[in-house]
Amino acid sequence: MSIIDTRTPEPKRFISGATGDWEVVIGMEVHAQVTSESKLFSGASTAFGAEPNSNVSLVDAAMPGMLPVINLECVRQAVRTGIGLNAQINLKSVFDRKNYFYPDLPQGYQISQFKQPIVGEGKIMISVGPDNKGQFEDVEIGIERLHLEQDAGKSMHDQHPTMSYVDLNRSGVALMEIVSKPDLRSSDEARAYLTKLRTIVRYLGTCDGNMDEGSMRADVNVSVHRPGGEFGTRCEIKNVNSIRFVGQAIEYEARRQIAILEDGGVIDQETRLFDPVKGETRSMRSKEEAHDYRYFPDPDLLPLEFNQAFVDALAAKLPELPDVKKQRLVETLGISVYDASILVTEKAIADYYEAVAEGRDGKAAANWVINDLLGALNKAGKDIEESPISPAQLGAIIDLIKEGTISGKIAKDLFEIVWNEGGDPKKLVEERGMKQVTDTGAIEKAVDDVIAANPDKVEQAKAKPTLAGWFVGQVMKAMGGKANPQAVNELVKSKLGIEE
């Protein structure tokens, strides 16, 4: 058991139906757009937000005689991702034609990988929690495969009252389809899995993970069955584009299937869509099987082959991944597993934290980054890259507290000033007279004044020592929050005759 494994012996959570418990089984197919300047088989740009049909080559438009040429960078990115998923890298893989007709698929088929994908089985560890005891459960989720394929174009039905338009900018963009095993057992696990997957590809730089731009989408397979029984018939929910919606879609779909089964009905294997406005799924079409697509090897593309040295060279240059980073932060900086889990969610946040924590108390740095900085960023709708406060500035605030120059309360005020106005925290403290008062004579006078003004509470405090906190608060208020809290606390207790 690792230091980040706080598994509890509690059983899996079941869904209660009218006739007993049910278990939900979830598998996910995540389509992650490969970070690459050009498309999988053409030199056209992959830039997001371009004018419709401005990033389309003759290959993307399926003009006669135009042949695909593999983009080696997309191959590298797929291999990097496979290594990050602890997966088997296949030194030989084959591209196949997946045949179906749709207006935004000009070739009449999609180039994908069927029987021989570039990446085989792997696994990732997710942490679900915290529960009501503050503990996390580590769950291993199997990866079935990762394969490369082309994205389709985009049909637009809201541009004209009687016609639909097609934008082929996305046609031919490289996708990694990452297929999990049916190991997920709750919407919480599914959200944690998708979050972890997005974190991994962002750390690797193989996909930007921006679900709002469509560069990461999830197809979610859901079925229910009685605990200990055979798996039920699954339904696939297509193209869910946010982690929150994935959870909502699973919750609704599981309940829908349970209601049908408890009424004596049967589940039809079908493809469904999630309506985020209504919070429900609706039928789209009957679910296709592999034979419906008539897969066969693409005659225009040779099998993709590389050697182990190619894989090893890529592995040697991979960045530190989230699980390794989390364990290192816990071991070297003494922070909690919970705090480390938050800090490694985004590489930029982890980098910011490590810059603040360098040469300082790791726990204090974690508290300021998580509670104050991330809280302020969330309230302002900003990313960590847009933070008005640099790691050096936040570190300087922490140093001022440790040195006793300012109190924790003054530090909060200083944080607000630096956030809104910028500047050197140390100079701001000097210029604005924000240093905490450590002169015991001045503090003692303030304590005496508060005690003299509240004789009734003095007697109460002697009977109930916790009331000393009220006196401390009044003294701090009288001194504008600048008094040293520890000195105030000690003097108040001494004057009231309260023993430690």
Curated annotation (Swiss-Prot):
GO molecular function: asparaginyl-tRNA synthase (glutamine-hydrolyzing) activity; ATP binding; glutaminyl-tRNA synthase (glutamine-hydrolyzing) activity
Ligase found in the keyword field: yes
EC class: ligase
Function: Allows the formation of correctly charged Asn-tRNA(Asn) or Gln-tRNA(Gln) through the transamidation of misacylated Asp-tRNA(Asn) or Glu-tRNA(Gln) in organisms which lack either or both of asparaginyl-tRNA or glutaminyl-tRNA synthetases. The reaction takes place in the presence of glutamine and ATP through an activated phospho-Asp-tRNA(Asn) or phospho-Glu-tRNA(Gln).
First and last residue of the signal peptide: none
Source species taxonomy: Bacteria, Pseudomonadati, Pseudomonadota, Alphaproteobacteria, Hyphomicrobiales
Reaction(s) catalysed (UniProt annotation): L-glutamyl-tRNA(Gln) + L-glutamine + ATP + H2O = L-glutaminyl-tRNA(Gln) + L-glutamate + ADP + phosphate + H(+); L-aspartyl-tRNA(Asn) + L-glutamine + ATP + H2O = L-asparaginyl-tRNA(Asn) + L-glutamate + ADP + phosphate + 2 H(+)
Organism whose genome encodes this protein: Brucella ovis (strain ATCC 25840 / 63/290 / NCTC 10512)
Enzyme Commission identifier(s): 6.3.5.-
Biological processes annotated in GO: glutaminyl-tRNAGln biosynthesis via transamidation; translation
Record PANTHER family: GLUTAMYL-TRNA GLN AMIDOTRANSFERASE SUBUNIT B MITOCHONDRIAL AND PROKARYOTIC PET112-RELATED, GLUTAMYL-TRNA(GLN) AMIDOTRANSFERASE SUBUNIT B, MITOCHONDRIAL
HAMAP family: GatB
Family: Belongs to the GatB/GatE family. GatB subfamily.
Name of the protein described by the UniProt record: Aspartyl/glutamyl-tRNA(Asn/Gln) amidotransferase subunit B
PROSITE patterns xrefs: GATB
